[in-house]
UniProtKB/Swiss-Prot annotation:
CC terms in the record's Gene Ontology section: plastid; ribonucleoprotein complex; ribosome
Keyword tags: Plastid, Ribonucleoprotein, Ribosomal protein, RNA-binding, rRNA-binding
Subcellular location per the Swiss-Prot or TrEMBL entry: Plastid
Xref: CDD domains: Ribosomal_L20
Location, primary (coarse class): plastid
Taxonomic lineage from the root: Eukaryota, Viridiplantae, Streptophyta, Embryophyta, Tracheophyta
Purpose of the protein: Binds directly to 23S ribosomal RNA and is necessary for the in vitro assembly process of the 50S ribosomal subunit. It is not involved in the protein synthesizing functions of that subunit.
Protein name according to UniProt: Large ribosomal subunit protein bL20c
Keyword set includes Ribosomal protein: yes
One Pfam assignment: Ribosomal_L20
Amino acid sequence: MTRIKRGYIARRRRTKMRLFASSFRGAHSRLTRTITQQKIRALFSAHRDRDKQKINFRRLWIARINAVIRKRGVSYSYSKLIHDLYKRQLLLNRKILAQIAISNRNCLYMISNEIIKETERKEYTGII
């Protein structure tokens, strides 16, 4: 009986998986079954953390803006700033405000002071 050699498709699939897992440690980069499990786990984590990254960056921007705003005025906070921005229809998103807060605090102070003056003037005249 002559020997029949296997096809190349399964080997090609396994080498592709091994290339994906080449940076993993221990058996996770050597054994085929654990490579497939770790690949599934890695892709699942990557998909989950792409959404989580957006949430974390938004949280970071809010914390930065709030820290700078609270240094300026005791009674003024992030939520009041965002509310006043929407009332005045200024299109500054949180990312831009956080960049301004880090790079140039005086500019953010000027923006917040203008908004505070505008709201106080409207409240004084009775227009809201």
